[in-house]
A protein has these predicted regions:
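PLP-dependent amino-acid enzyme catalytic core
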Residues: 1-216
Length: 216
């Protein structure tokens, strides 16, 4: 009999590596991509959504029937909503009113409560509102994806180790987009632990407020 998972969260991680044959046919090496959209909510953020909740449960900060709060307009919100639905937590997500209707519909489908903030206040307005909600509600935690140590740690333990194992340690360069920095930092540190000569590159939009060539 094949493996039967106890819940949807057990399917997070273990995503495949696929060779880009057309892209690398004229290159001296192989270009591989890790298909994080194979995660149940279709993004790499599923890893940190579960990891953040796991850590909060383990520390006793998040108790049964509690509420998870975060300011997010992206995939982290979807991941937290998924985990909340699977574990029985309330999820409250704050975001500027300028965010797409499609994103709001998806989040509500997972059972999340959406609190919209003035678009003129940007993401800072959403962050301020999230802090306010956590203060007002009992048994509530702030996910803090940008500052939560569980974010890079889950990539050290899973993403980086998966890449190393699936390539039999044949990794020269690791490239990742940078949002919170958790993926490139955590996975990059693991790869460099196995082989200090691995080069790690973080990629972000040119217009980003951050300007850095390396984080590892």
């Amino acid at each position: 009999m094949g493996k039967i998972y106890n819940d949807i969260l057990e399917t997070i991680g273990g995503t495949p590596l696929v060779r880009l044959n057309r892209l690398d046919k004229d290159l001296p090496g192989n270009v591989l991509v890790k298909l994080e959209f194979f995660n149940p909510a279709n993004s790499v953020k599923d890893r940190i959504g579960k990891a953040i909740v796991d850590a909060a449960e383990a520390s006793g900060e998040l108790k049964p029937g509690g509420t998870i709060v975060e300011a997010t307009s992206g995939n982290t919100g979807i991941a937290l909503a998924l985990v909340g639905a699977a574990r029985g937590y309330n999820v409250v997500l704050t975001m500027p009113e300028t965010m797409s209707l499609e994103r709001r519909v998806l989040l509500r489908a997972y059972g999340a409560e959406i609190v919209l903030t003035p678009g003129s206040a940007g993401m800072q307005g959403a962050v301020d509102k999230a802090n306010e909600i956590v203060t007002e509600r009992g048994n509530a935690i702030l996910a803090r994806q940008f500052a939560n140590a569980a974010n890079p740690e889950v990539h050290r333990k899973t993403t980086g180790e998966e890449i190393w194992a699936d390539t039999d340690g044949n990794v020269d360069i690791f490239v990742a987009g940078i949002g919170t920095g958790g993926t490139v930092t955590g996975a990059g540190e693991t790869l460099k632990k196995h082989n200090p000569d691995v080069k790690v590159y973080a990629v972000e939009p040119e217009a980003s407020l951050r300007d850095r060539k390396s984080v590892v």
